From Swiss-Prot:
GO cellular component: extracellular region
Molecular function terms, GO-annotated: cellulase activity
Primary role: Has carboxymethylcellulase activity.
Protein name from the UniProt record: Endoglucanase Cel12A
Coiled coil: none
Documented EC number(s): 3.2.1.4
GO annotation terms (biological process): cellulose catabolic process
Location relative to the cell: Secreted, Extracellular space
Family designation: Belongs to the glycosyl hydrolase 12 (cellulase H) family.
Source species: Gloeophyllum trabeum
Reactions that this protein is recorded to catalyse: Endohydrolysis of (1->4)-beta-D-glucosidic linkages in cellulose, lichenin and cereal beta-D-glucans
Keywords: Carbohydrate metabolism, Cellulose degradation, Glycosidase, Hydrolase, Polysaccharide degradation, Secreted
Top enzyme class: hydrolase
Taxonomy, superkingdom: Eukaryota
Length: 36
């Protein structure tokens, strides 16, 4: 599926990296979060 890489900065100054895997035409999204 389509993989989207997104990096977000929260007020807690934590950087969270998300890999979104769209698995089907229904738009199923599986977010995998990694704290660094």
């Amino acid at each position: 599926g389509v993989q989207i890489s997104q990096i977000s900065s929260f007020p807690t100054t934590a950087d969270v990296s998300y890999d979104f895997n769209i698995t089907n035409a229904l738009g199923g999204i599986q977010p995998v979060g990694s704290l660094k």
